[in-house]
Amino acid sequence: MSSAVMPPRRRVSKLFGAICFYVLAFGVAGYAVFAYGVMPLGALVHPDMKLNFIAHQAGIYTHVFASLVALTLSPFQFSGRLRSKRPQLHRLMGRIYLGVGVVIGGLSGLYMAAFAFGGWVGQLGFACLALGWLFTGLRAFQAIRSGAVQAHRNGWSAMFR
């Protein structure tokens, strides 16, 4: 529905949702850069968790920074303006999002799930989240490759529900 025919209340609601999405995505990304890029590893977590982070530095850094790529690209990928005015850029960013953010972030998350703080419940939750991202990313990629644009959009938006 275009904004010209969209009821004013719906436009405000949609704008509010978009602003919240951008603020949260960039806020979490900024925190991740600070917590894992500026501060010493594990400085902001429980001491036992810090030991776990230090024991698995490569896994934690790979997961955090690959997932950071997905987090910072996601608001732009949901932009209808970008999709319509710069489709090649949308596709390039989508490939980076999928290849780095979802595949590398998901696989490193699956690896890190074995060492997640919080016992088997934390480990299972972390593993399910990683598998969910990998599965949803694969389905969305398959959808766009087969020309199913709406299924592709639904797949990507499912990652943020």
Indicate where each model-derived feature is located.
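Alpha-helical membrane insertion/targeting regions
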Residues: 2-161
